[in-house]
Amino acid sequence: MTIIRKKHPLIKMINHSFIDLPTPSNISSWWNFGSLLGLCLMIQILTGLFLAMHYTSDTTTAFSSVAHICRDVNYGWLIRYMHANGASMFFICLFLHVGRGVYYGSYNMIETWNMGIILLFAVMATAFMGYVLPWGQMSFWGATVITNLLSAIHYVGTTLVEWIWGGFSVDTATLTRFFAFHFILPFIITALVLVHLLFLHETGSNNPTGLNSDADKIPFHPYFTVKDFLGVLILLMVFMILTLFFPDILGDPDNYTPANPLNTPPHIKPEWYFLFAYAILRSIPNKLGGVLALILSILILALMPLLHTSKQRALIFRPITQTMYWILVADLLILTWIGGQPVEYPFIIIGQAASIAYFAIIVILMPIAGMIENNILDLD
């Protein structure tokens, strides 16, 4: 008799995705981040649900309701800090997951890759709206600055901004709708994750060599369930150390001041995970140009399959492109640092140079390096 996991319509789907899934035997720990992102999403949905039970999305009470959660609700402080730092862990895993995809040429699985880009945009939108909810100074001014960027769109821009605000400034209408969207988006993200996995399981996982691994596959369980569990333990350990010992290290002190439309903070900046894109936005003097560069900084990932010139898939045996890749990583760290600095000399020029380097490496240098390597290895 066939065991239930292979027969039952519902369990059969889980079986094909997480138990009997044929997996390349040589995938490294860089392949752990998919499951860790799933864990982060679950943590965020659960903590967010409990926060939503006590939060009020009205400008007069939003800040006080967050203070009430931290002071009066049982373990409210823990739930709040888990949710805030959970977002940071989510983005750390996201960036490493995308970085892994770029390094090992996973972008050649085009449907999975494009679905991943849509997911990245959705998660970024969710995080941005979540940052507005505590209604501190940085929440209010961050929302004002970022939504105002839409006014750069010709003809309809101003109308669009006022439509999103629900008035002539960021106010209760804006906060209420941001809360509604922030609540619903994680569930949409969960659905998109299932589509992401559906596309992935059509082609099967990539592996560190970038070669076809059909001849050497093993079941996902128990080998990779155990391996993923180690990743889960490490993530939870780092997460709890961050949450319990350094809960505010990644936040902005300005957000402990209630929102005040009459008082602008000296340096308006988003959360750390948006700083690289914020630096690219600020490095262009023109408003519309900055907005386009901001969108392109993420959307450029969609061009990666077209910019792949090498006959090899992964970077593991491609030292020139490897060098370009690590320069790109360093460049992103520089952009992150610049995004948090005031707009003055020398930060402006460093930001502009780093922004040019970011696009140049992806669009020009890495494809050229791929062609050079083909010639060196006589692969043409």
Swiss-Prot record:
Binding positions for a ubiquinone per the UniProt entry: H201
GO term, biological process aspect, one: mitochondrial electron transport, ubiquinol to cytochrome c
Family to which this protein belongs: Belongs to the cytochrome b family.
Chain residues that bind heme b b566: H97, H196
Free-text function comment from the UniProt entry: Component of the ubiquinol-cytochrome c reductase complex (complex III or cytochrome b-c1 complex) that is part of the mitochondrial respiratory chain. The b-c1 complex mediates electron transfer from ubiquinol to cytochrome c. Contributes to the generation of a proton gradient across the mitochondrial membrane that is then used for ATP synthesis.
Descriptive protein name: Cytochrome b
Bilayer topology term: Multi-pass membrane protein
Principal location class: mitochondrion
Residue sites binding heme b b562 per the record: H83, H182
Source organism phylogeny: Eukaryota, Metazoa, Chordata, Craniata, Vertebrata
Membrane-spanning residues: 33-53, 77-98, 113-133, 178-198, 226-246, 288-308, 320-340, 347-367
Annotated source species: Microtus longicaudus
Subcellular location(s) per record: Mitochondrion inner membrane
